[in-house]
From Swiss-Prot:
Attaches a formyl group to the free amino group of methionyl-tRNA(fMet). The formyl group appears to play a dual role in the initiator identity of N-formylmethionyl-tRNA by promoting its recognition by IF2 and preventing the misappropriation of this tRNA by the elongation apparatus. The lineage of its organism: Bacteria, Pseudomonadati, Pseudomonadota, Gammaproteobacteria, Enterobacterales. This is Methionyl-tRNA formyltransferase. (6S)-5,6,7,8-tetrahydrofolate binds at S113, L114, L115, P116. It catalyses: L-methionyl-tRNA(fMet) + (6R)-10-formyltetrahydrofolate = N-formyl-L-methionyl-tRNA(fMet) + (6S)-5,6,7,8-tetrahydrofolate + H(+). One of its GO terms (cellular component) is cytosol. The keyword Protein biosynthesis applies. InterPro entries: Fmt, Formyl_trans_C, Formyl_trans_C_sf, Formyl_transf_N, Formyl_transf_N_sf, Formyl_transferase-like_C_sf, GART_AS, Met-tRNA-FMT_C.
Length: 315
């Protein structure tokens, strides 16, 4: 194989842990792992380690959990490891310029989109919501900007009509490690060919919010159906009925024109709950009332038919 590189890995969630696992199987030398501090989780708010920390400790790797990499003493932790390259995957902390320049080959990042499209925090969800035909991963050389560095390697995959953010996440978690290992080989061999991003093609993937996931019936049925898939499994699209939030897990588009005001319930039967939108009809198929499990529209109608009387409007 190519030269074995001394690698610092920086990442936090499961998506990152899958990349670390691939690195550990690749023959490279992971000399240290940076991940975010343990966070309170669950009902008991017990401090929980990140998936990356769990894997790193299982493999006996040195783990560092600074709150920030701005203090000089924390930057020294990076310098002391004398790495050839730092691999960053969904780490969640900003790397100052001094840290970016410490490894011999700099720092590289695995980003969940085909840059320069969808720079930012939520590329998977934004690509789905926008109706993109494909997405993928980009391995890039990091600089001080937000996902602005030169691109080293790309892998793409189609977005299907059934994909959710959850299924795309899994697809990219398979693609990312493949691209990462190939990029590291090219860096070690000196065959990498950095490509400058075309600034005229840039779009931004802003962070998601729960309020943004509230269904806006003035949008088209096609947009709302994509939104429901984009926000699954988090934060989940939702609507409000009698002051209660009801999550929507699945819906379909009925390509029929209607003059009814957006949000008007047109039909409620075993085929679903059909609601007028700004353009077309959205058929709600799977919903989850507060405190309940997700259920089919038919099961919800059996217990809450009064919520979905044809002619009433959802707001």
């Amino acid at each position: 194989m190519s030269e074995s590189l001394r690698i610092i890995f920086a990442g936090t969630p499961d998506f990152a842990a899958r990349h670390l696992d691939a690195l550990l199987s690749s023959g490279h030398n992971v000399v240290g792992v940076f991940t975010q501090p343990d966070r309170p989780a669950g009902r008991g708010k017990k401090l929980m380690p990140s998936p990356v920390k769990v894997l790193a400790e299982e493999k006996g790797l040195p783990v560092f959990q600074p709150v920030s990499l701005r203090p000089q003493e924390n930057q020294q932790l990076v310098a002391d490891l004398q790495a050839d390259v730092m691999v960053v995957v969904a780490y969640g902390l900003i790397l100052p310029k001094a840290v970016l320049e410490m490894p011999r080959l700099g720092c590289i990042n695995v980003h969940g989109s085909l840059l320069p499209r969808w720079r930012g925090a939520a590329p998977i969800q934004r690509s789905l919501w926008a109706g993109d035909a494909e997405t993928g991963v980009t391995i890039m050389q990091m600089d001080v900007g937000l996902d602005t560095g030169d691109m080293l390697y790309k892998l793409s995959c189609p977005i299907t009509a059934e994909d959710t953010s959850g299924t795309l996440y899994d697809k990219l978690a398979e693609l990312g490690p493949q691209g990462l290992i190939t990029t590291l080989k090219q860096l070690a061999d000196g065959t990498a060919k950095p490509e400058v991003q075309d600034e005229t093609l840039v779009t931004y993937a802003e962070k998601l919010s729960k309020e943004e996931a509230r269904i806006d019936w003035s949008l088209s049925a096609a947009q709302l159906e994509r939104c429901i898939r984009a926000f699954n499994p988090w934060p989940m699209s939702w609507l409000e009925i009698e002051g209660q939030p009801v999550k929507v897990w699945k819906a379909s588009v009925i390509d029929t024109a209607t003059n009814a005001a957006p949000g008007t319930i047109l039909e409620a039967n075993k085929q679903g709950i059909q609601v007028a939108t700004g353009d077309g009809i959205l058929n709600l198929l799977s919903l989850q009332p507060a405190g309940k499990k997700a259920m089919s529209a038919q099961d919800l109608l059996n217990s809450r038919r009064e919520w979905f009387v044809p002619g009433n409007r959802l707001v």
